[in-house]
């Protein structure tokens, strides 16, 4: 390969919505409001899961980790996006881009595994209620959560290292809001077939396998619910699973759109960021973390009771 034109990039420029200047102020206001909701909503869920003894169960331990994950993910990306929207400062350092890519990929991978663990937890609770305390004891659910975080971190380390090691031939303009891995790989002037293969393997491990766990868990749950004679029992089982299932549909719907389409199609796409792609990216990165605590607090009686208890206790203390 001709190496004359290859130069090391010291920083990147994130185009974002620069092609739609009238939308930038609107997006700034929307993202800012949603970020505040994310911090408050997920923060309340974390505090409630720690302080309220009624939530000291595996499901709420997973939920607390999911809320913490959403805060970490959005905090690694939203503040810089807000700054670029309001100040027109669109440059990000090479190391800053790598850090942003790492956290985004790590949090996404971890969330896939966490959602799978939560589905398995619901399967054991509904299909094997008598053995639930034995199967899902504290050692088990803490270990499952630790594996989720560790595997997500390892996957992100591998993908980020492979993506950032290529020469970029002086081309440093990223057609995205963030240092998203596919957008960065478009700038590489080397053969990225290794990245495509590793991303495909990652998709199988972190998208397909957890989704299979979720699918079969809910098949067994549905079978058990339909066999239940008690209408109250069926309603309780459905209400317990509905929040998680809603989050799964929203999360996997957006992430499959972004990462499960053919890589050649994505990497050879148009130079300008499509409006639909930008909206889906924002939905995945901002709207989904905002909806998670809202969905769980609206659908789950225990969470609603815990939040009301915390708010009432705070009002009394004041």
From Swiss-Prot:
Residues exposed to the Cytoplasmic side: 47-54, 121-139, 218-237, 299-318
Residues bearing attached sugar chains per UniProt: 5
Chain segments annotated as transmembrane: 26-46, 55-75, 100-120, 140-160, 198-217, 238-258, 278-298
Subcellular location: Cell membrane
Keyword Glycoprotein found: yes
Side of membrane Extracellular, spans: 1-25, 76-99, 161-197, 259-277
Name of the protein: Olfactory receptor 13C4
Gene name, Swiss-Prot/TrEMBL: OR13C4
